[in-house]
């Protein structure tokens, strides 16, 4: 399942391909959104990620929230590219140069843009780890809160209500970097350990976003190994 960094990068790609572009055509082939096919002049005015979801905002006051789960996939191609696919097409946006398509996903929700934050899924999400306003202090406060302080880190780091966007590989890398076991609880940690864990959560997640899923510190890797190993092939410390 794509985690926060992969979802954010895909949202970036979609934004570049279709945001505020004139759409030659569009298709909405999931029953939750098929009424949009009857509307003329639809344009994508914004694309963003929130945790593991992508929210596409349209110029008609509607937003489409999609979650790829294990099987959904976005693709972006030139209009001249012939695509062979055995997946079910769910959404297609076509501009004069690019075609963006969502395949196979089933978790697709149509929202009123002004009421996005009232949807139960969005309302219950924790702070987005990749949001610039989510700081190390924000994460530390979550760890020390009554709601989360007595939960094992192995489960907590996958809980989207704690911090949105974390998943299996990020959890493994964060725990390794922090020197902590999955059975450890935030309440077992002292102030320095809370800070180090919070820092690892933020830094490793941002690094994965910036380095296309690679969680290794590139500068540290170069100092340690020079040209002995290919940085691009060794993507994680433990996962």
Protein language model features and the residues they cover:
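A cross-family signal for N-terminal binding/gating loops and helix N-caps
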Residues: 1-103, 107-111
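Alpha-helical structural motif
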Residues: 3-6, 10, 19, 118-121, ...
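Residue-identity detector for glycine
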Residues: 4, 13, 41, 51, ...
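Basic, nucleic-acid-binding surfaces and adjacent catalytic neighborhoods in DNA/RNA-processing proteins
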Residues: 22-35, 48, 142-239
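Short clusters of hydrophobic/aromatic residues that line enzyme substrate/ligand-binding pockets
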Residues: 39, 125, 189
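Phosphate/anion-contacting hairpin/loop surfaces
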Residues: 64-165, 170-177
């Amino acid at each position: 399942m794509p985690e926060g960094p992969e979802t954010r990068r895909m949202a970036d790609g979609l934004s570049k391909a279709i945001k505020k572009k004139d759409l030659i055509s569009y298709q909405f082939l999931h029953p939750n959104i098929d009424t949009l096919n009857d509307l003329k002049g639809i344009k994508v005015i914004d694309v963003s990620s929130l945790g593991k979801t992508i929210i596409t905002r349209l110029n008609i006051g509607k937003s489409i929230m999609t979650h790829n789960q294990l099987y959904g996939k976005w693709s972006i191609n030139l209009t001249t590219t012939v695509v062979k696919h055995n997946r079910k097409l769910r959404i297609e946006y076509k501009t004069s140069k690019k075609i963006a398509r969502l395949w196979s996903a089933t978790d697709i929700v149509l929202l009123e843009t002004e009421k996005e934050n009232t949807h139960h899924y969005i309302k219950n999400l924790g702070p987005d780890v990749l949001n610039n306003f989510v700081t190390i202090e924000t994460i530390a406060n979550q760890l020390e809160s009554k709601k989360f302080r007595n939960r094992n880190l192995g489960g907590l780091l996958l809980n989207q209500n704690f911090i949105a966007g974390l998943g299996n590989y990020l959890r493994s890398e964060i725990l390794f970097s922090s020197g902590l076991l999955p059975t450890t609880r935030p309440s077992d940690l002292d102030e320095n350990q809370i800070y180090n864990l919070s820092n690892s959560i933020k830094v490793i997640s941002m690094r994965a976003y910036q380095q296309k899923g690679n969680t290794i510190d590139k500068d540290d890797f170069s100092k340690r190994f020079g040209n002995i190993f290919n940085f691009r092939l060794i993507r994680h410390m433990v996962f």
